[in-house]
Structures are given as structure tokens and as C-alpha cells.
Regions:
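Beta/coil-rich, acidic/histidine-enriched accessory regions frequently appended to metallopeptidases
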Residues: 27-38, 215-219, 233, 242-353, ...
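A flexible loop/linker signature enriched in serine peptidases of the S9 family
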Residues: 183-184, 295-296, 314-323, 337-342, ...
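C-terminal outer-membrane beta-barrel translocator/porin domains of Gram-negative envelope proteins
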Residues: 556-564, 631-650, 659-663, 687-865, ...
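Juxtacatalytic substrate-recognition/specificity segment
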Residues: 27-157, 163, 171, 210
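Acidic/His/Gly-enriched intrinsically disordered linker/tail segments
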Residues: 28-30, 99, 121, 125, ...
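Blade-terminus and WD-like Trp-Asp/Gly-His loop motifs, strongest in beta-propeller folds
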Residues: 301-309, 344-352, 390-396, 424-432, ...
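Outer-membrane beta-barrel initiation region
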Residues: 296, 522, 527-529, 534-633, ...
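Extracellular/periplasmic ectodomains of large secreted or surface enzymes and adhesion receptors
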Residues: 262, 268-307, 313-314, 337, ...
Length: 930
């Protein structure tokens, strides 16, 4: 048998295994001890170390459930809620498949401008994610009929087909309506919408989805939530539940505008245009200088104690973010260093103290401190310390430490009960400490003598968000959004409060320079900008009062150990039918799922043929119960027809496969190492029907049982960015060693495979991303009496999942474009491909009102070469060789699902084996092959 292409899984079970395993690894560390708090509507899973936060979460979850159920239909069944504390970043996510479940990360968003407007972090994130469950679980009409028969089948939830601004807009609308915070009433989304409107970049309802172009992931949240806010103002609060009910039963689930009109009597486009149009008139150009522009992350400025240098974050979306240092007077760049995400920093003397995220285990992402010394040396100071927001002054460094559900300061005498700290900043003379403090549902600005933390005084304690404290001599600069936009204010002892900026789209993160000017960041339609301007002091308007805050009431809870089965059990099934001609007509079912923690993931299918009576199917299980390594077990059987003799005797083949493996993985932010060791079984058997000796009807039908093992090594280091068309730096290495021995026979097979992928930034004509040079080299060999041959040639495609197992595309280990698959065969093979990739256009536009869109386009010029040969023969790697070009289109289907299409033409540079004519070959492929 020749193996030209890397085959896709032949069993539905194995095709699903990667999906369920991937979902499991995307959550929390499922190993170790977990407990469960059972409430009326939730199973809340937590580690014993997060018990206090879990009890808080139980109260907030039931509060959110009660408020949402007053307006929306309650979801079916008990909701599994996982309280994770493995990532030092604020986030959460929800899913309605295989059952209703959500995950909340306990770390609070202390300085994230998009999330800092909250009265209680767990309240806000739980309300947001639970709204997704209420919304997406709702089904009516024929969708409910299908689910009543087959269960919670993927693809039968109509509200999941709508554009992302609907789901995220609804969740953001309710997070703001049902809590004392939220992004609708915060200022960050106002900045997003004002900047887009002023630049004429307002998104339509079909473009406010997850396109790559700026503002990227902010758009669905900002546009969607403000639309639903306006709709509720125009048609009443009840219009929102009516809209959800309408979309939950519509036959064509992509429609939005019709259901808006039927639910509210309002026109989608008219209401959509109303909000941003009001903002356009506010566009003015402030006085000052732009120092950095079109950045994807806020370039927070930090001025060195001597006032001569400025550190800021440079993230243009084209390559990895960098921490840069520039001369404060001339803005001449002095040095730079690549950083990860979650980056915050400050000067301690002439050294930069940097906090950033990185993997500390396979599952855990922690914020640790690094020191960037004046000589350019970069040294890690802590590991697994959970230290965030370093601020320094007068030679003193203060860094809050994250704890489950909050953070703490290691300062004796400071009252920290019920407090979440923002930035804590020592004064330049080290006599005072200023901080932003979240307490009793809102932020305030506080100050205390460095030697007497118990003498804390509240300087500003009003409504809105207070953030970004910075010293200006003995005065304090800070940011407040009392006017609806964030602006910089100045507090000085004995003087009235002043507002010192009036930036049209807001100003954040102030830093004072020795000449009296200010550095600050602002938001535009092209991204973040860093400005330098003179302060313009004005008296701010009367300050709003802080809203009252009430804790969620106690709820009855029952604590148990974690039990996987309630969420692990099958939640759906689908029928299977296979017609294998004379080998049997099979009917059966399949299912798959995972538990709430992602500790186990499985897939199962079984089918039976009545005549002749046979069964086929498969089972696959992945276990992350140990954390590292992961274990996997799979087994499958399949029947197929070989031939039918002239006498009507049917010869069928039975293929059996089984494997038991263990995978060990180590990870860093841009690097990983993974090794899998597996024991494997493969069996082939033949059956004649009616039964008789096989040798009399099929000479080559020999039963084989092969037992062996394999080792697979993957090593990688990749540097990429949101706009990148490919990694612009890095290497991926895959190596496979396998041995199989046929039982009862001296036949054996050894196999070695290796593939190297290499990427480097290349000179180009510019554009929205960097040009990239990419290399792929692959080689393999097989030896032994049972060795099969490799096939070289053909186009290798990525794989696009259609859901429920089926996929489009398929990869080849030894492709050479311009030739047919397996044009040459042998037990030795090697290929090499070189590509030059260039960006063409960043589009980010829907195709009319259809749920498809064009995200971006790029192109590639390539050259391929390869050969296959037998041991003892001379390799001719130019035997197959070609050159050509590809147009690469990144598109979206179903509004937000990304799909990459490659349309290419390859010119063979050598005559195909067998004497076929040499002519250009066109092709269409899916996804990226490398």
C-alpha cells in the first residue's frame, strides 16, 4: 500500500477526538483536588484554595440567574460553572454544548480600560457569561423538535448563527443593566464608537464582527451593546426579550433585521446609525504631538526618575510587542526588547521593572517580574509569584500580588478588607503613597504617608471610574470619566481639583515631563496613540455621586467532591448509516462530549449490520486527570468490501486499530515542546460469505496482526501577531519514529519521519503586515519486510471542520504542487518547499447583507521539489520540481467563522513520470498547509 497523503480519520470517532481534546485543554488545569458547591441552579466547581471566592461566586451566580430569568426564558438543566484561577488575567467564556457551562477566571481587571468599570468583578463577568447561556440555549420551533429527539446536537442552536455583535452585544447590555458597572455605562466603548464615527469608519450591522482590522475584537461588544441600549430606549426594555424569542425559532437563523422589526417595530439600520452619527460632531484636533500611532495595545508612558528617558509599549499588530525606551527630548529610540502580554512596567532608578505573563506549567499562566538593566540585560526576578502593576518612586517598589478573586498589598497596617487595588504609586521623594482603590462597588483615589499606612485618606470618592495615578511633583495626576470620556485630572493639596486635558476621544495613563508637558494615550479609529501636549487646566463639572452597592444575598449551598459524570454523560446522539455494499449495511449512532473541567473528553460510535451480522465502530478517550502527561486510548473497527467472485462469494476486509498513548508537554509564551509515546495495534482480517477457506477465493487475503509503538516529538518557537499573514519568525520541528512487528511472522516495519518548518521576516513592499519567507522540508524512510512506500506529489491542504466529524481538505506529508498525488513512490522520500508571502489588502467587509465576508488577502510565490526512491537507489530531489503562485483569501462564513482559501497555479518544471504531458495545474485548497 502506498501512503501519499496523510489520511484523515476514517472513523467519525477519531475525527472528533481532536476537537474534544482541544476543548478540554483550553480551560483550567483539571488535575488535582476540586470541590463543588451545589446551588439551586448551578454546580460551581472550584479548588479548595479558592473556597472564599467560590462562595462569593455562588451568591453572584444565583443573583444573576434570578435577574435574568425575570426577562428571559431560563436555560434547561443545571449550569456548570468553573471558577478558574490558573490565568492571571480577567476573562470568562460560556458554551451551550455539550451542556450549559461557563468558566470564570477569578483575577480582577484592575487596569484594563475596557473592563475596569465594575461594581463587583465576579458579578459583572458572571452576568455577562450567564446571558450567553440564557440566549444561546433558547430554541423554539423545529429546532426544539430536533433537540427533543436527538438531544443537544451541535448546529441546532439557532441563536449561535447570528453575528457576534448580537451575542456579545446582548451580554454586554445585560451586564450593564443588571449590575452597577458594565461597558455600556463605561467610557471605553464610547471611545471606540466616537473614534470610528469621527473618521468615517462606522461599522454596519454586517461588519461589526470579528474581522482582523482595528478595532478587532472590541467592535462586536461596543457596537452590539450600544445598539441594544438604543433599541430598549426606543421600544422599551421588553423589546430585547421579544427579539430573542423571535430569533430562537426562525427557520433561517442568520436573519437579524426582520426579527428586530417584528420585536420592536424599529428598523435595524435606522437605529444602528443613530448612535454613532451623534458622535461625529465631537471630532476636533487637539494641540500637541503624536509620538506613536496605530498601535494595538495601549502605549503606557513611564518617565525615568531623571526625566531623560521614556519607556512605552510598541505593538503595531504586525509583529510581537516590544517595550521601547526613547529619549524624552528628541524621541530618539535607545533600546527595545520583545515582551509577551499583560505587560506593565516602571522605572526603579535606571532599571525597568517589568511584569508580564508567561506559562509556568502546561496549564498555568502567571504574571512575574523581570528586570531590564541599563546595559540591556534582561533578567527574570520571580517565578509563579502573581505580581502585577509594578510602580516605583523614590527608590521604593510596590507591586500588588493577585489572590483568588482579588489582590493584596504586603504593607503592614493597611486595611485591605474587601479592597481591590489598582496601581499603587510611591511619590518621587518616597514620603507618600497614592493608589486607586476599589471598595464598596466603586473606585476612589487614596493617599497615605509611607511611614503610616493606617493614616489613609480618600482624595476622590465619587461615581465613575478613577484610574492611572501618577505623581507630578507633590501633586497627583489621575484619570476619571465623569464627563463620559476619560480625561486627566490634577489633585494638589490645598488647591481645587483641575481637569488638564480635553482630548476628543479621551486621555489615559498620564506621565509628567520635566518641561511641564504631559504624555498620555488616546484612542483613534486606527488604534492607540501616544501624545505629548501641554496641560490646559479647567475646573471639572460637579462630580457625580457614587451609586449604592449591595452585596448579593446568601444562598443555600451543598458542598461535595467533584463528580464528572453529570456533565460528562452523553447529551446528544445522531444516527449513522454506512453502506459497505456486500460487506454490510450498517446503522448506528455516535456521540461525544467532555466534563465541565475538561478532565475527560470522549467520542463513541457504534453501528450494526443485520446481514451478515457484524458490528463496527470506535471509541476514543483523552484524559487530562493527571495534568501532565495526558493519556489517550482509542480503538476502532471497520468493514469494507474487497470483491465479489463470479460464484457470488463476498470477500470482506476487517480493519482493527487501537492505541494507548501518553503526551508530556512543556510550554512558554512562544515556545512549546511535546512528546507522545504510544503503544499501537493494527489488524487486518478477511471473511468469505458464505464461509469457506479464504485461500480458495482470495490468494492475497492474509490475516495480519501488527503490534508496535511510536514516539512523536514536536518542538516549536513561533513569533506572530494579529495582522501577520504567517509567523514572521520561528521554527517548528516534528519527528516520528515507529516500529511494528507482525505477530506469528518475521515481518516487521521501521519508520522514521521528520519535518521542519522555518519562518523569517523578509523585505517587502509594505502593507498591513510584514512579508515572510517560509520553508518546509520533509524526509522519511521505511525499512523491513512489511514496509510500505511513500507517495510524493500533489497539493497539501489544511483541514476545515464542518462540525460533527466531517472535514474538508487533507494534508500530505510529501507534497509537490503541479503533479498528481503519489506521482512517484518509494520507501525513501524527501520534499522541500520555499514560499515568499506578501500582504495584499486588509478588507474587513461583509458581502452585502450575507453572512460571509472578506477579511484579508495575501499572495505567495513558491517553488517545490521532491522525490521518492528505493533503498540503494540514488535520490534525485529535482525529479519533481515546480514553481507557481497562490492567492490567499481569508474569509468569514456564518458571519464570524474564519476560513482560508488558497487558489493557485503550479508549473511543473520536469516532465511527470509515466510520460504525461507537462502543463500548468490549477488548484483550490483550504487553510494553510504550513
Amino acid at each position: 500500500m502506498t501512503s501519499g497523503a496523510v489520511p484523515s480519520c476514517r472513523r467519525v470517532t477519531l475525527a472528533l477526538l481532536c476537537l474534544v481534546a482541544g476543548r478540554a485543554t483550553a480551560q483550567v488545569d483539571p488535575s488535582g483536588s476540586w470541590r463543588t458547591l451545589q446551588t439551586a441552579h448551578f454546580r460551581i466547581h472550584f479548588r479548595p484554595t479558592t473556597r472564599a471566592a467560590a462562595e462569593h461566586e455562588a451568591r453572584e451566580a444565583e443573583r444573576a440567574y434570578g435577574l435574568l430569568s425575570r426577562e428571559l426564558h431560563a436555560p434547561r438543566g443545571v449550569v456548570d460553572l468553573v471558577l478558574g484561577d490558573d490565568i492571571d488575567a480577567a476573562n470568562g467564556f460560556a458554551t451551550m454544548f455539550p451542556s450549559n457551562r461557563l468558566t470564570v477566571f477569578a483575577a480582577p481587571p484592575t487596569t484594563d480600560p475596557g473592563l475596569e468599570h465594575f461594581d463587583d468583578w465576579l458579578r459583572l463577568v458572571t452576568t455577562h457569561e450567564l446571558t450567553h447561556v440564557f440566549h444561546l440555549d433558547r430554541t423554539k420551533g423545529w429546532w426544539r423538535v430536533v433537540q427533543s429527539v436527538f438531544g443537544r446536537v451541535p448546529g441546532t442552536f439557532p441563536n449561535a448563527y447570528q453575528p457576534s455583535w448580537v451575542a456579545e452585544g446582548l451580554a454586554t447590555y445585560y451586564e450593564s443593566r443588571l449590575t452597577g458597572g458594565g461597558r455600556v455605562t463605561g467610557s471605553f466603548h464610547t471611545q471606540v464608537l466616537l473614534a470610528d464615527a469621527a473618521a468615517g469608519h462606522r461599522r454596519t450591522p454586517w461588519n461589526a464582527v470579528f474581522f482582523t482590522r482595528w478595532p478587532d475584537g472590541y467592535a462586536p461588544y461596543a457596537y452590539g451593546s450600544r445598539f441594544f441600549e438604543r433599541l430598549s430606549e426606543a421600544a422599551g426594555d421588553s423589546a430585547i426579550p421579544r427579539f430573542i424569542e423571535r430569533t430562537s425559532g426562525q427557520l433561517i437563523p442568520y436573519r437579524v433585521g426582520r426579527q428586530v422589526r417584528r420585536a420592536s417595530g424599529r428598523d435595524l439600520q435606522t437605529e444602528w446609525r443613530a448612535g454613532p452619527a451623534r458622535a461625529a460632531a465631537r471630532s476636533i484636533v487637539p494641540a500637541g504631538n503624536v509620538l506613536a500611532a496605530r498601535l494595538w495595545t495601549e502605549p503606557v508612558p513611564r518617565v525615568s526618575p531623571d526625566g531623560r528617558r521614556v519607556a512605552y509599549l510598541w505593538d503595531d499588530g504586525k509583529s510581537a510587542p516590544e517595550l521601547r525606551v526613547a529619549d524624552a527630548a528628541t524621541w530618539r529610540p535607545l533600546r527595545r526588547h520583545r515582551v509577551n502580554r499583560g505587560v506593565r512596567y516602571d522605572w526603579l532608578g535606571d532599571t525597568l521593572i517589568v511584569a508580564q505573563l508567561d506559562f509556568t506549567t502546561r496549564w498555568r499562566i502567571r504574571s512575574d517580574l523581570y528586570r531590564w538593566l541599563p546595559d540591556g540585560a534582561w533578567r527574570r526576578s520571580t517565578r509563579d509569584a502573581r505580581l502585577v502593576e509594578p510602580r516605583a518612586g523614590g527608590g521604593r517598589l510596590i507591586v500588588p500580588r493577585l489572590v483568588p478573586g482579588g489582590n493584596r498589598l504586603d504593607l503592614a497596617g493597611l486595611d485591605t478588607a474587601g479592597v481591590i487595588w489598582g496601581e499603587v504609586v510611591p511619590s518621587p521623594n518616597a514620603q507618600w503613597i497614592a493608589a486607586t482603590r476599589h471598595h464598596a462597588g466603586h473606585w476612589s483615589l487614596v493617599r497615605w504617608p509611607a511611614a503610616a499606612p493606617e493614616s489613609l485618606a480618600v482624595l476622590v470618592d465619587d461615581g465613575g471610574t478613577v484610574s492611572d495615578p501618577a505623581w507630578d511633583g507633590e501633586a497627583l495626576l489621575f484619570v476619571a470619566d465623569w464627563t463620559g470620556l476619560p480625561q486627566i485630572h490634577r489633585w494638589a493639596h490645598g488647591s481645587p481639583l483641575q481637569r488638564v486635558t480635553a482630548a476628543p476621544f479621551g486621555a489615559r495613563t498620564p506621565a509628567a515631563l520635566p518641561d511641564g508637558s504631559l504624555l498620555y494615550t488616546t484612542f483613534t479609529a486606527g488604534g492607540w496613540e501616544l501624545w505629548r501636549a501641554a496641560p490646559a487646566a479647567t475646573i471639572p463639572p460637579p462630580l457625580p455621586e457614587a451609586a449604592p452597592f449591595d452585596s448579593a444575598p446568601p444562598v443555600p449551598v451543598h458542598e461535595t467532591g467533584y463528580r464528572a459524570w453529570p456533565s460528562l454523560k452523553p447529551h446528544f446522539w445522531l444516527p449513522l448509516f454506512f453502506d459497505q455494499a456486500g460487506a454490510g449495511r450498517f446503522a448506528g449512532a455516535f456521540t461525544y462530549g467532555s466534563d465541565a473541567l475538561g478532565r475527560y473528553a470522549y467520542a463513541l460510535d457504534v453501528a450494526v449490520a443485520p446481514s451478515p451480522l457484524r458490528a463496527q465502530g470506535g471509541f476514543a478517550l483523552v484524559s487530562h486527570a493527571l495534568g501532565n502527561p495526558s493519556l489517550d486510548l482509542s480503538a476502532a473497527r471497520q468493514w469494507s468490501l474487497v470483491f465479489v467472485t463470479g460464484a457470488g462469494i463476498v470477500v470482506s476486509e476487517r480493519e482493527d486499530h487501537a492505541a494507548l498513548g501518553a503526551t508530556l508537554e512543556a510550554r512558554r509564551w512562544r515556545s512549546f515542546a511535546r512528546i507522545r509515546l504510544a503503544a499501537e495495534y493494527r489488524g487486518d482480517g478477511y471473511v468469505a460469505d458464505p464461509a469457506q477457506p479464504l485461500a480458495s477465493v482470495c490468494v492475497g487475503c492474509v490475516t495480519r496482526d501488527e503490534v508496535g509503538g511510536s514516539a512523536t516529538l514536536n518542538l516549536g518557537h513561533l513569533v506572530s501577531a494579529p495582522l501577520a499573514i504567517a509567523p514572521d519568525h520561528g521554527t517548528l520541528l516534528t519527528a516520528v519514529a515507529r516500529r511494528r512487528e507482525q505477530q506469528g511472522s518475521p515481518r516487521w516495519t521501521n519508520e522514521l519521519l521528520g519535518r521542519l518548518l522555518w519562518y523569517a521576516r523578509a523585505p517587502g513592499v509594505g502593507g498591513f503586515a510584514h512579508s515572510v519567507l517560509a520553508l518546509r522540508a520533509a524526509a522519511g524512510g521505511r525499512a523491513g519486510p512489511g514496509a510500505e512506500t511513500f507517495g510524493v506529489g500533489g497539493v497539501s491542504s489544511g483541514v476545515f471542520s464542518l462540525g460533527l466529524g466531517p472535514t474538508l481538505g487533507g494534508s500530505r506529508f510529501f507534497p509537490v504542487r503541479g503533479y498528481a498525488g503519489s506521482s512517484v513512490n518509494g520507501r525513501r522520500a524527501a520534499t522541500v518547499s520555499l514560499e515568499y508571502r506578501v500582504p495584499l489588502a486588509l478588507v474587513g467587509q461583509a458581502l452585502g447583507h450575507l453572512p460571509v465576508g472578506a477579511d484579508r488577502f495575501s499572495a505567495a510565490l513558491f517553488a517545490d521539489a521532491g522525490d521518492a526512491w528505493e533503498p540503494g537507489e540514488r535520490a534525485r530531489l529535482h525529479r519533481l520540481r515546480s514553481a507557481g503562485a497562490e492567492l490567499v483569501a481569508d474569509v468569514t462564513v456564518s458571519y464570524d467563522v474564519p476560513l482560508r482559501l488558497r487558489v493557485g497555479v503550479a508549473e511543473p518544471l520536469a516532465s511527470p513520470p509515466g510520460g504525461a504531458a507537462r502543463r500548468p495545474q490549477g488548484y483550490v485548497a483550504l487553510a494553510a498547509d504550513f
